[in-house]
Amino acid sequence: MNVGFISLGCSKNLVVTEEIIGLFKSNHFNIVNKKEDAEIIVINTCGFIESAKQEAINTILEMAKLKNNKCKYLIVAGCLVQRYKKELEKAIPEVDLFISISEYKQIWKEIENLLDLETGKESNLDYHNRVLTTGSNMAYLKIGEGCDNHCTYCAIPNIQGPYISRTMEDILKEARNLAKQGIKELIVIAQDTTKYGLDIYGEARLPQLLEELCKIEDIEWVRFLYVYPESITDELIKVVGENDKICNYFDIPIQHISDSVLKRMNRKSDGASVRNIIEKIRREIPDVIIRTTLIVGFPGETEEDFKELYEFVEETKFDKLGVFAYSKEDNTPAAKLKEQIHHATKKSRLRKIMALQEKISRESLEQKVGNVYKVLIESRTKGGNYYIGRTYMDVPDMDGVVYIVNNTKENLMNTFVDCRIQRAKDYDLFGELYTEGK
């Protein structure tokens, strides 16, 4: 039977989708890209914030229409199901099977029952049985599940449960296997990568893990995402600064800078410590790229709080920045707080931060013009006039790309090249191959 997949939400969810694809493939199902050709459609949902929930519902309803054609079975899994399974079963009867995260241990049994199959296999989700969907060069490497931070706005601890690290041996085994498949870049992910190892080793071991990953011969780039400011150690900064394979890129979701807002969010850092860690990273690693995520319109955020945040962004000049309007989530402490901010105010504050960041980003990219960067080529434009790639400054699907004029007869796909930047536009860079001295 033909099976099609849709993965919604974050990269951590994508890894689960890749594991589910691996389950079907190892049981001899045919994986198809076009949903119109699929007899089974599997949707792995996100349920983190309101916009993600709405996207998931819309996608489910859209795919349900295909049951009038080839699609015989519609399966929905993931975070949205974990949060609202009973409600979804009542509201969308077109779905044949809802699988929550807590049911993943028996996922294949559930699917066998639905399809009336008996493979006789004890099949479970397995990091080592993933089918990669991220192309030939890059793979996400998930090092843990769940979260212990309990920020008051966030439903993830309720959805995913407590933080559980994988053993370093298991992670390295997967990483070596990915390298054998031709993967050149590993992106280390978890809800909080800086907490890695704390639960099984009694101490955080992200720096040691990164060093071990750098020893894998065919891996050329290692980067990590989702590091919390209070857990960034001198050792981590030192390891990043001293290892050529580790991209000088810190993704630090600070959420806010006002002490009063951070306290209501139950964040473990205050404004001063956030400022200090950013200054320290930039001092120790001069060419570092720092990305952050902010929330505006959190309950009780005053005009003074927002002004402090705006001025902080203006002064700090983050290289990359994402901002969300606060989303009131069921069964979270923040949803019960008084002084909920009006929707229009949240949107206004979001627009102001984004307008400021667009200006900062444009100025930052213009400073790159004339410089030469190592670029990983991943695709081409339709006409083939440009190669498209990324520098160490760019995370897939989060940041920009580099367009490189294709003026060579060589096939540069899936290779690293040197590129001289000629111009910047919006969030992207344009350049030419740099061969001087070669």
Swiss-Prot record:
SUPFAM superfamilies xref list: Radical SAM enzymes
Q: Where is the Radical SAM core domain?
A: 133-363
Q: Which PANTHER family match?
A: RIBOSOMAL PROTEIN S12 METHYLTHIOTRANSFERASE RIMO (PTHR43837), RIBOSOMAL PROTEIN US12 METHYLTHIOTRANSFERASE RIMO (PTHR43837:SF1)
Chief localisation class: cytoplasm
InterPro entries linked: Elp3/MiaA/NifB-like_rSAM, Methylthiotransferase, Methylthiotransferase_CS, Methylthiotransferase_N, Methylthiotransferase_N_sf, NA-bd_OB-fold, Ribosomal_uS12_MeSTrfase_RimO, rSAM
Query: Per its UniProt record, what Pfam families does this chain match?
Result: Radical_SAM (PF04055), TRAM_2 (PF18693), UPF0004 (PF00919)
This protein is called Ribosomal protein uS12 methylthiotransferase RimO
Q: What class of enzyme is it?
A: transferase
In the record, biological process GO terms are:
tRNA modification
Q: NCBIfam families, alphabetically?
A: 30S ribosomal protein S12 methylthiotransferase RimO (TIGR01125), MiaB/RimO family radical SAM methylthiotransferase (TIGR00089)
The residue ranges of the MTTase N-terminal domain are 1-116
What's this protein's function?
Answer: Catalyzes the methylthiolation of an aspartic acid residue of ribosomal protein uS12.
Q: What is its EC number?
A: 2.8.4.4
> What does the record say about how the cofactor binds?
Binds 2 [4Fe-4S] clusters. One cluster is coordinated with 3 cysteines and an exchangeable S-adenosyl-L-methionine.
Q: Which gene holds the coding sequence for this protein?
A: rimO
